[in-house]
Regions:
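Non-catalytic, usually N-terminal nucleic-acid engagement modules in DNA/RNA processing proteins
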Residues: 1-91
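Catalytic cores of enzyme domains
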Residues: 61-65, 69-70, 75-245
Length: 245
């Protein structure tokens, strides 16, 4: 349950200050491997699905006018029972409750890093001026599907929060091994064919203004997506067999 003192994350509202530990005045920039491993275990303990890491490029920092480099992406899988609910305002409310429940723990993770001598600050997950998905793509650990969803290997139902930190020796990835997904999506198209709102134009490009996912909780495209029905690994094996033919 969400603490009664937690204001929650809201659009157009400042990020709640729910930290219990101050940032160190002279933060460390290298984390021991065993401490990072413990941090990962701590995240999993709270039912998150794992961590990814982004090293933001200079071009990206200039584009969004930010001055931090290193980010930790803290991922969770949205509840299957919610995903399978019929679309409604109530479904949207319950999904927001789930999001807030996970979010309060991210302050605890930031406090843990601060206690161990690192600067750690949560990025507002609903920020107007900064794209969370763009930061996630900098990790080389995800791709955007044809249905405009952010796909990690953890699953297509991943939600995430982001902490920027002074830690410079995080296990960043230099290459993205998921780029094959774009080619696979081009051979599928079930999200386009079965969209009840026809939220794709004549060129099969997603039109956000027509999608009712955020207003009503519609996720028909997700429920029919092979990455949801079969999982990343099975789809990858199927794709590899298809390419070899």
């Amino acid at each position: 349950m969400i603490s009664s003192s937690f204001e929650g994350f809201r659009y157009h509202k400042p990020l709640p200050n729910f930290y219990k530990v101050e940032n160190p005045k002279n933060p460390n920039n290298e984390i021991p491997e065993d401490l990072l491993s413990y941090f990962n275990e701590l995240v999993l303990k709270y039912n998150f699905s794992g961590l990814s890491y982004s090293k933001l490029s200079e071009e990206f920092k200039q584009e969004f006018n930010i001055d931090f480099d290193n980010v930790i992406i803290i991922k969770f899988l949205m509840g299957d029972n919610l995903i399978k609910m019929e679309k409604s305002r109530e479904k949207c409310r319950l999904m927001d409750d789930e999001f807030q429940d996970y979010g309060i723990h991210v302050y605890e993770f930031a406090d843990f890093l601060r206690e161990n001598g690192f600067q750690a600050d949560l990025i507002h997950p609903l920020a107007d001026d900064l794209s969370m998905r763009a930061i996630a793509l900098q990790s080389n650990d995800c791709v955007i599907t044809r249905s405009n969803m952010c796909l990690f290997k953890d699953g297509i139902t991943v939600g995430f929060f982001i902490i920027h930190t002074s830690i410079e020796n995080l296990p960043f990835k230099s290459e993205n091994d998921m780029l094959w997904v774009e080619d696979f999506c081009s051979t599928c198209g079930v999200c386009i064919d079965r969209c009840p709102e026809n939220a794709f134009d004549e060129n099969e490009k997603f039109q956000r203004k027509l999608c009712t996912a955020h207003r009503e909780g519609c996720n028909d495209c997700l429920l029919r997506c092979p990455f949801y029905k079969r999982g990343y690994d099975k789809v990858k094996r199927r794709y590899d067999r298809m390419v070899k033919r």
